Amino acid sequence: MKAVHMNASGQVQAVGFRYTTKLLADRLKVTGWVKNNPDGTVEIEAQAPDAVLDQFIDGVKASPSPSGRVNKLTVKSIPLFEGQDFIVKY
């Protein structure tokens, strides 16, 4: 099990990116959250077994939204956290 903090930049707002990231997380049973930042990036914290989280990260890199595009994705390991769901923060 591992947890990461991610920041995605590119065409990631106003394209359904948060919603489709949540759908991907729910399908893979990843816990955490996703939210838009005022600077136009999208921030994500996610936790899952190692192989599942790697698959989730790959899905985010490829943009879960067909209208989106991730130009840069930073991924940093963070401590494990409590949570059973993946939510969209506003």
From Swiss-Prot:
For the Acylphosphatase-like domain, which residue ranges apply? Answer: 3-90
Q: What is catalysed by this protein?
A: an acyl phosphate + H2O = a carboxylate + phosphate + H(+)
User: Which Pfam families would you find in this protein's record?
Assistant: Acylphosphatase (PF00708)
Q: Which GO terms describe its molecular function?
A: acylphosphatase activity
Q: Where is the active site?
A: R18, N36
What family does this belong to?
Belongs to the acylphosphatase family.
Q: Which protein are we looking at?
A: Acylphosphatase
User: Which source organism?
Assistant: Pediococcus pentosaceus (strain ATCC 25745 / CCUG 21536 / LMG 10740 / 183-1w)
